[in-house]
């Protein structure tokens, strides 16, 4: 019996956050590596959260202090981070 091995080259495009711009009122315009852009409104997520480690980002100065790290929006060394797919869909 001969076992056939099929070589299939899979090409997977990983989408990353390339840049982001704070617009105001807890909204950030996110620019993705595939050229797509999404305006993400974080305010409803922050306001409905009951957890103090999330609610602290209702301090606008703290919220605006994000960075792009490993292709994603990141607050305070992974203290607050969202799945890229959720950012892409604008559904937090």
Question: What kind of feature is each model-predicted range?
Answer:
Residues 1-92:
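Motif-centric detector for short Cys/His coordination patterns
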